[in-house]
């Protein structure tokens, strides 16, 4: 069982990594979480436009042009080789956000320092836990939108038509849904920015939760051009809202994956490490 220091009330962490059993990994985990929550409230209340970049292990491989996992050409981020894109746009863009979060695994922190010349402001686990315990939804009700892969945003929109799911999240609705391609969004950064920017100009949300894959390295810092909002990268938390999260991801151990019994809605969806045989599931019926 992970230490009390690393608990986020209202969530369960199934991740067995030793870092969660060592108080020295991140001694101020609880104090910094309160600071993080206070900062978000302050930024939203003041209608400030700020960006939060969540670093994960895949970002290291993408930023160093290594064909590993999601960073491999033809897999998810790119349909073509690194030599065929302006990779420097992503490397430079990754340095230009306002705040940075990183999972507390020692390897991730070490690799972060190799590719991003900024300090880590907060553990990325906060973005998981505060979705898992619904704090973000309740705190920013009426002000919150989503940015993510088109396939997953479509699922979420359909789920949110059900009152039962609204009650589960503690949120009547998301104010805005902004879509980007699930695959190969890094092939043409400017085209992806244009697609997202045109949507953002029509939004009213004061805070966006985002999960956009590796294109974020070049894109996140550009979003402030289109609307004044807090852009919070929560990574795979978007998968949780879409009802397809791997419950062994940090702090989603008690999450219920709500789904709709309509197979076409899930065609072509990138399920990442999601396993439908593990965790709690609930199938919603259409009214």
Regions found by a protein language model. Give the residues of each.
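A short, acidic, amphipathic alpha-helical segment used as a generic capping/interface helix at domain edges
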Residues: 35-39, 84-88, 188-200, 216
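A mid-sequence, solvent-exposed acidic-amphipathic segment
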Residues: 165, 170-207
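C-terminal functional extensions of proteins
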Residues: 215-287
